[in-house]
Amino acid sequence: MLELLVALLALALAYFALLDGWYLVRVPCAVLRARLLQPRVRDLLAEQSYAGRVLPSDLDLLLHMNNARYLREADVARIAHLTRCGVLEALRALGARAVLAASCARYRRSLRLFEPFEVRTRLLGWDDRAFYVEARFISLRDGFVCALLRSRQHVLGTSPERVVQHLCKRRVEPPELPADLQHWIAYNEASSQLLRAESGLHDILKEQ
């Protein structure tokens, strides 16, 4: 019995030492909770909330939530959001998937140890290649927006328009994207062109 306990302890230590253990547990739990315990969200543009609290494992050396943790929490909240509104299910039905192609973050105020917060996620819109998602970190102490994250979910294997049409059973015009988001999209495109030029891909693509 003791040997079994030691083996299980060693296995648990190896799991958390070699893998991102809590993340690999939380994501499936978030998906199952969104599917089984929460109601389906029919409005693609509706805001959804995901509750959290700053834990000791989230802290940096200044005892604030580590900047990288915001990206992780936004990732979990985004997966739950896309599950509840049916986007992930539609992607699977179409044999497609969405990958994170770009993100940006604004940090406005630190979240401190044990501070409760909400990640409010919403779909801002889409174009011919990607969905654009926003996540706001709201302190539940005073309602302040502590951080704002935007992400570009690039769709592979189909188009965002087909995903939305699959969900809504009709063609839906995408909403107009906010001006600041349009500037960010333009920045990403300019950055992509610059990187292609640096690697020689720009000339290759033009020849093709």
From Swiss-Prot:
| Top-level taxon in the UniProt lineage | Eukaryota
Write down the PANTHER family for this protein, in alphabetical order: PROTEIN THEM6, PTHR12475
Q: Secreted: present as a keyword of the record?
A: yes
| Descriptive protein name | Protein THEM6
As for family, the record states:
Belongs to the THEM6 family.
Presence of keyword Phosphoprotein = yes
Which cell locations does it reside in? Answer: Secreted
GO terms for cellular component:
extracellular region
Q: Which residues carry this modification: Phosphoserine?
A: 199
Q: Which SUPFAM superfamilies match?
A: Thioesterase/thiol ester dehydrase-isomerase
Provide the alphabetized UniProt keywords: Phosphoprotein, Secreted, Signal
Q: Which residues constitute the signal peptide according to the record?
A: 1-21
